[in-house]
């Protein structure tokens, strides 16, 4: 079990999980608020 915890705490694994979570969050926000990522004033 110690080896699994060590593996999951490495930088590439944490980065993959973080960016996957962030991408999913942005996709869901863009689904409910489709114009939020577009700046109409520009």
Swiss-Prot record:
> Transmembrane: is it a keyword of this entry?
yes
Q: Where in the cell is it found?
A: Plastid, Chloroplast thylakoid membrane
Q: Which Pfam families match?
A: PSI_PsaJ (PF01701)
Which keywords appear in this protein's UniProt record, sorted alphabetically? Chloroplast, Membrane, Photosynthesis, Photosystem I, Plastid, Thylakoid, Transmembrane, Transmembrane helix
| Membrane association type | Single-pass membrane protein
Q: Which GO terms describe its cellular component?
A: chloroplast thylakoid membrane; photosystem I
The UniProt entry, under InterPro entries, shows:
PSI_PsaJ (IPR002615), PSI_PsaJ_sf (IPR036062)
Membrane-crossing residues? 7-27
Any one GO biological process: photosynthesis
- Keyword Ribosomal protein tagged: no
Q: Tell me its family.
A: Belongs to the PsaJ family.
Function comment: May help in the organization of the PsaE and PsaF subunits.
Name-wise, this protein is Photosystem I reaction center subunit IX
* Species name: Huperzia lucidula (Shining clubmoss)
Name of the gene encoding the protein in the UniProt record: psaJ
């Amino acid at each position: 079990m110690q080896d699994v915890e060590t593996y999951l705490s490495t930088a590439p694994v944490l980065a993959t999980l973080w960016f996957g979570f962030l991408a999913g969050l942005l996709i869901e926000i863009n689904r409910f608020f489709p114009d939020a990522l577009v700046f109409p004033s520009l």
